């Protein structure tokens, strides 16, 4: 591993400049797409990319372009096709950030095994700690409110986030049959498309809203490292708060894996520490200036997440979900973050639900250890990998039940704005959770 960058050495003025720096390589590809003859068709074709081995079919794009723009100048269409083809080729074929050293590859695998063998805890920590802390940061969340997508379709972003994390934390995420590389490239491009659309004011937004330059640029470098740290630091601290015992080596492996993912997402090296303890300091530096009481975004974003958790968790009511929020967070944050900023009254939390969760979690760990103890030594090395794959499949099934679209992995559609979401909702109207469960496990069943 190389010597870690240390953004803590930057002055406040230098650090703040990163709120005005974006991601030029991804922005170039987004600009080419948005200036294409019919970019909605390009979105659909790019949306078909899932596996790392998938390729963009430019023949399909060319055919669609002439169909939708038959009255256009053929030379102009040809120029735009070639320009966009080069831009997208340059973007998707540039995999330098995924040329990992043997040491980095092993670290990514160890982090994936850790995530998947603790998937229940990691997923809950992601939901009730990582995302809620994201929503408490005022400037970073303005883009979520401005685009309207999260307020109108809150579950889509929550589930898409979970899908992304599962794609990049799969044990085979960065192998040809995996989904991690494409998921990262698509998310990076989604950010760039949103930035470009805000810059030219073509994005569906809250009527009358204007982007305030004091917020910085949309999805800027500081926002990006902040978000990456909520997926690494906050997940780890959530597990520790809930009572999990995690070694220093596991903590550093998990953090370093997300350092590599952050780099691939376009975070600049000088803002992307490779050491956990430096990352912790950087994240708290951002929290101190972004966590403010007068944050109208926080409650508007936090409440749909709580409702989502009530819907997907078995036998959970509001008090039970608030109990999980308490379990996975630190007592010092209960009032200043959850009460004052997000308007979540954790005093209403139920201890019964968290007690039941802890009991079943402890029992699961005991059973895992017993089974491992009685395994032949020759099979022990693959035991946790198999366990991770099984838990990964289980959570994928939960996500598939909860969502209202058919894509199996991280999608690019939400970069299009609310029109795509509305179109998608019409194709698959939301059913109650129990009906979706029936349809998932029994596809031929008639459920009205």
Positions of PLM-derived features:
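Mature, function-bearing regions of proteins
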Residues: 1-448
């Amino acid at each position: 591993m190389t010597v870690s960058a240390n953004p803590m050495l930057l002055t406040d003025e230098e650090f703040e400049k990163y709120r005005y720096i974006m991601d030029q390589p991804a922005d170039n590809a987004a600009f080419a797409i948005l200036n294409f003859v019919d970019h909605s068709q390009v979105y659909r074709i790019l949306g078909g990319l899932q596996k790392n081995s998938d390729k963009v079919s430019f023949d399909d794009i060319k055919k669609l372009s002439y169909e939708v723009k038959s009255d256009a100048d053929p030379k102009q269409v040809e120029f735009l096709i070639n320009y966009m083809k080069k831009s997208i080729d340059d973007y998707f074929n540039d995999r330098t950030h995924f040329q990992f050293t043997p040491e980095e590859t092993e670290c990514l695998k160890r982090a994936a095994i850790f995530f998947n063998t603790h998937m229940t805890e990691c997923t809950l920590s992601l939901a009730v700690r990582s995302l809620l802390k994201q929503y408490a940061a005022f400037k970073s969340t303005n883009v979520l409110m401005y685009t309207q997508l999260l307020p109108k379709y809150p579950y889509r972003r929550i589930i898409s986030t979970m899908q992304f994390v599962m794609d990049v934390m799969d044990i085979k995420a960065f192998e040809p049959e995996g989904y991690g590389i494409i998921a990262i490239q698509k998310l990076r491009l989604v950010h760039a498309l949103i930035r470009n659309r805000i810059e030219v004011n073509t994005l569906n937004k809250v009527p009358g809203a204007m982007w305030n330059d004091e917020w910085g640029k949309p999805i800027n470098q500081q926002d990006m490292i902040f978000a990456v740290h909520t997926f690494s630091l906050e997940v780890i601290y959530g597990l520790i708060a809930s009572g999990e015992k995690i070694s220093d080596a596991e903590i550093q492996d998990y953090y370093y894996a997300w350092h590599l993912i952050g780099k691939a997402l376009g975070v600049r090296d000088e803002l992307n520490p490779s050491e956990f303890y430096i990352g912790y300091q950087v994240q708290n530096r951002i929290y101190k200036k972004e966590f403010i009481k007068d944050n109208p975004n926080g409650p508007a974003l936090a409440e749909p997440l709580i409702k989502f958790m009530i819907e997907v968790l078995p036998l959970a009511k509001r008090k039970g979900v608030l109990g999980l929020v308490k379990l996975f967070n630190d007592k010092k944050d209960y009032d200043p973050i959850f009460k004052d900023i997000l308007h979540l009254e954790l005093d209403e939390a139920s201890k019964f639900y968290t007690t039941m969760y802890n009991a079943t979690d402890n029992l699961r760990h005991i059973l895992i250890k017993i089974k491992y103890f009685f395994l032949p030594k020759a099979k022990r090395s693959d035991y946790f990998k198999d366990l991770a794959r099984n838990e990964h499949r289980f959570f994928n099934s939960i996500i598939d039940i909860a969502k209202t679209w058919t894509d199996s992995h991280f999608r690019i559609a939400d970069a299009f704005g609310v029109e795509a979401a509305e179109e998608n909702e019409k194709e698959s109207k939301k059913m109650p959770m129990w009906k979706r469960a029936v349809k998932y496990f029994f596809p031929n069943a008639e459920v009205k």
